């Protein structure tokens, strides 16, 4: 969550923190970062974020933005995925509020960050950043004095190179 006002306890210069102080009706921004693993053994690579928001938060589907940052020929580059390169599904099941899925992260990274190492394999490790917003709604007033409204996210990813990205997936722990 990005804190909406300066706070000496937040050491991150852009005010990103695990908690925030918002009022009903305000937009609450979220940001998650991860790194592209070595996916040379895959033909395709599935990558998805699963999010479970409190009922006091209303997800803004149109606010989703995904960027991949890395280097090309020694120069910094950030690529923003188009809306056709990922899908947002609300209430996909399993208690998730929504899911953001990139069907083939490998194809995008290989196209936009085409560096290879001395073995002629693609170089990975780029940073993937997903941002989106929610609005603190009137349900927040139903339980005043509580410590806050939880928002949990986990990453789902291909984890079987032999299945061509269509098979088994793994998950990170909820955070």
Regions found by a protein language model. Name each.
Residues 33-70:
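Low-complexity, serine/threonine/proline/glycine-rich extracellular segments that form mucin-like
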Residues 1-41, 50, 150-155, 159-175:
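Serine/threonine-rich, low-complexity linker/repeat segments that form flexible spacers/stalks
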């Amino acid at each position: 969550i990005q804190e909406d006002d300066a706070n000496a306890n937040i050491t991150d210069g852009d005010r990103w923190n695990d908690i925030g102080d918002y009022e009903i009706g305000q937009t609450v921004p979220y940001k998650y970062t991860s790194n592209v693993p070595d996916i040379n053994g895959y033909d395709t690579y599935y990558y998805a974020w699963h999010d479970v928001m409190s009922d006091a938060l209303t997800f803004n589907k149109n606010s989703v933005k995904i960027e991949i940052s890395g280097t090309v020929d020694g120069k910094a580059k950030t690529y923003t995925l188009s809306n056709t390169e990922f899908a947002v599904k609300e209430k996909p099941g399993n208690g998730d509020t929504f899911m953001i899925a990139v069907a083939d992260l490998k194809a995008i990274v290989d196209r936009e960050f085409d560096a290879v190492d001395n073995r002629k394999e693609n170089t990975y490790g780029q940073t993937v950043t997903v941002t989106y917003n929610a609005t603190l709604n009137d349900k927040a007033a139903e339980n005043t004095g509580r410590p806050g409204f939880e928002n949990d996210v986990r990453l789902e990813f291909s984890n079987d190179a032999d299945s061509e990205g269509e098979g088994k997936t793994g998950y990170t722990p909820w955070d």
